Amino acid sequence: MFEIFKKPLSRIVGATFAFAGVTLLACAMENGVAMAEGPTFQDVASQVFGQPVGPDNDGTLYIFGLTAKYTEPEYVDGRGPYKSFLKMLPSIRWYDPEHYWTNGSQTEGVFKNEECVLCHTVQTPTIVNDWKQSSHGSKDIRRGIGIKKDGKPVEDLVGCADCHGNNHQKLEMPTYKLCNDCHPKETAEHRAGGLGSHTHAYTVNVLEFSWHVGKPAEEVTGCAHCHAIAENRCSGCHTRHKFDPAEARKPTACRVCHMGIDHDEWAMYNTSIHGALYEAESARMDWGKKLKKGNYRVPTCAYCHMQNGDHNPQRFGTIYSDMGMFQVDRGAPKHKAKRDSWIKLCQDCHSPRFAADKLKEMDAGVNLSFTKWREAAAVIVGCYLDGVVDPMPEGSAPDWYGHYTFSLLPGGDPRFYATSNLERLGLEMICYLTGNVYKAYAHMSMYNQTYGNGSAFEQDRKLVEIKTEAAKLRRFAAIEKKIGLEHKSADFWKHGEYLDLLPGWKRKPGDVDVEWFKRTDIPHRANADAGVEIHH
């Protein structure tokens, strides 16, 4: 069965694929789209494997996917300043219902709450059970929780029609705006944040953010959904249809979003003494108690960042530092008021001297971590200035601005894709490592400060990788200069089946909504409007 791997045939296959690669690179390019003048890679793969070329959405099992042709899914138009080329998948309707929700119900009629409950007891029984146990569906537990705008307590049940309407052909998907009718205090707090908060997690940090705008919708949909539900819907933290505050008080509610290589707050908390206490005490704790001093033995995400139930976690932060990628000394005199408030919070369990020492420890560790990053950045920028980066910006696909700007320069777009390996390593160092050094110190994760995820020693490894890559580039450049060879970056850095899908190719004059950046009701990301001058 392994005859296919015999050397003669393997040479034929290799030569055939090599021919395909040369053919593809020789394809004429027009407006960033490959114009196939010869056989495509899929055509050659079809000859090798004996499988016809076909669309990737027809249900066929394609061998290694090599004979499949990409088919764009259904999109909906995006929003924001780049709406002319930003696309979303239809599933965004569940996370940004105010702008995308469409009622798909086939049922007709206007129904009372008890009729909704009767039908959905059969159709969606878990939803009904949750509602009956919630403060919306049980008079016994709801009194005194919901307060109307007029200051009177909500005593009647909050039924299906109160949130979704009673006309089945006009059903609505609620947002925080509807919750505001009964929970004005919590809603006001939720809407009081600045840049980097839940308040603007989607409208600013997705619609203006390069890592979303600059990629095909299919691969960044998770980012859009996570950010959108944080901004637009209250059910991200206390899920429907129970909407239990006890659920939102547990760290696992925060873990859904605040985890992973680029912002690993969960791992930092979970590997700290605080996290160990949570694991030990969680089953015995009364999560129904409010977030007040003395109610909890374990410091949780909500206890520290949502003091007394404040729904603006950012209120207790010192300053937004772009997930820790921007340097700031949080212990500096200008931030004394914030520092004092944190020490006061820590006094629930610790002496003020201990708390102050641990926070100073964080300041020192963070400041040192940026010396490594600057050392790495100097190496990277030096290679760019000497023209030895491969590819140089003009040799790669354009960034989402439609530019060919070096990633670390003003107006540049730091990215993991369609860029040189040297720049990619640099972005990993500042985003995956340096940012998480701060999070490790801030959450008292002693191991991760030094050895673990996003640690000082991981920074060391990345710094060596960056210098090794830079040394190779300089050695190659020296050899090429000595033998008189003028290097040109390979075309695969600029074009490919995936690269040709990138939005940067689609940028054209007049495609930016310049008025968006005149809005004063939202903060704006740095560099969000880069290149507007040449695109309007």
Swiss-Prot record:
Binding of heme c 4, residues: 223, 226-227, 451
* Protein location: Anammoxosome
Q: Where is the signal peptide?
A: 1-26
Query: Which of this chain's residues are annotated to bind heme c 1?
Result: 116, 119-120, 168
Record-listed heme c 3 binding positions: 136, 179, 182-183
Q: Which residues bind heme c 2?
A: 160, 163-164, 241
Listed GO biological process terms: anaerobic respiration, using ammonium as electron donor; nitric oxide biosynthetic process; protein homotrimerization
Q: Binding positions for heme c 6?
A: 198, 254, 257-258
- Per UniProt, where does heme c 5 bind? 234, 237-238, 311
- What is this protein identified as? Hydroxylamine oxidoreductase
